[in-house]
Amino acid sequence: MSFGFFFVYRSFAREALIPSDSAMGSVLPADLFLGENNMQLYIAGGCGDQGRNCFYIEGDRHAFIVDAGTSTDGLDRLPDLSPEMIRRAEYLFVTHSHKDHTGAIEYLENNGFTGPVLMSNQTYQQIHYKPKNTMILDSTAPELSLDGELSLRWGRTGHCAGAVWYYITVDGKRLFFSGDYRENDTFYRCDAVRGLTADLAVIDSAYSRMDRAEDMRKAVADAAKDALSASAPLLLPVPSYGRGLSMAMLFYQTFGEAYPIHMSAKLRDQWLRIGHRSYFAHEEILGYPFDIFRSWDETSLEGGHIYFLTDAQLSKAKSRQLIDCHPELSVLMTGSLHGYGKAKSYYESGRAAFVLWPNHLTKQETADLAAANAFSLVVPFHNPKEKPETDVYTF
């Protein structure tokens, strides 16, 4: 198996893909491309793009959307969905709470979408805008029939609390959407996807590199240790939900109590709420005392201590002031540097270091996941550097 710069991979021979010559802003007539039981995937964002993850699927009898994000380039660009698409969609399936997957939900509802918005309870708690018609996934029943021709299974992705993948059966077709996917995370559980058969799989492939997560985690731990060995405090800006708990757990398991770990209130609250819940955290974590991670006022600093700040892009003036007023403070960025904060400028000026933490899949891991299943068509997403051959695929 080989994967090109941007790949659409078929694991066994099928009919050729039928690209659209039309712009994404219009709905294609069903009889133009669709034969009996054929469906189309419209990439409304998320492939060769900065965030804005959104996929529209339609067939003769059903249409739905998976994720509705805005761009992360500072422009808050909306998905490329026509008014007809928005009105026709019966369901919106949300994989997790991050803005690049949920930022356009309100826009869809304001422009004619009236169907249920499916998401996990944690995702619902985390998002700011609450959809008008929300259907919460039941964690005790990971299979759901929405009508006689549309049903789904779902599972945990390991990306953050509440993040899920979807395996959807509709009109005789089977579709898999990985969401932001991470097996073997240091904190979050993942329901590893194995042995599925699908006509279409849209899979996280955020990192173009060909290594795997364990190498990336080691690089982050090594960078942290190098910074701490000089007895300086270490600051790690992170999102409110996601990799913060994963990195904190790696540091605790690697360094023990040699370097005390402090957290912004929002992140420590996450730790207190889910750190001892077996649904979210790995078994070995459940017995750790809560005080292994300390509460932090986002002001005080001590040399040789680790500080997690819930401001991943350094958007807040208070965060930047903390860095500017403490030249001894080491700053380590570990995620994408977006356009709506100042994190990128701190990195480009040399004030912050950067080592990528693996909370998505590398291209190698995308290939691994595809090889562990029987996916006829694989469309990778979440990589701004890799553009698809077309915005529309028939399967």
Placement of each model-derived feature along the sequence:
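Glycine-rich phosphate-binding "P-loop"
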Residues: 203-218, 282, 347-360
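C-terminal regulatory/interaction regions
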Residues: 291-395
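Pre-active-site segment of Zn-dependent metallo-hydrolases
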Residues: 35, 47-94, 98-99, 103-115, ...
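Short, Lys/Arg-enriched N-terminal segments with co-localized hydrophobic residues
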Residues: 19-38
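Metallo-beta-lactamase
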Residues: 121-163, 169-171, 276-304
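Catalytic core of the metallo-beta-lactamase
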Residues: 56-59, 143-200
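Active-site neighborhood of phospho(di)ester-bond hydrolases with catalytic His/Asp-centered motifs
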Residues: 66-68, 89-100, 105, 117-120, ...
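Hard-cation-handling environments
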Residues: 223-332, 381
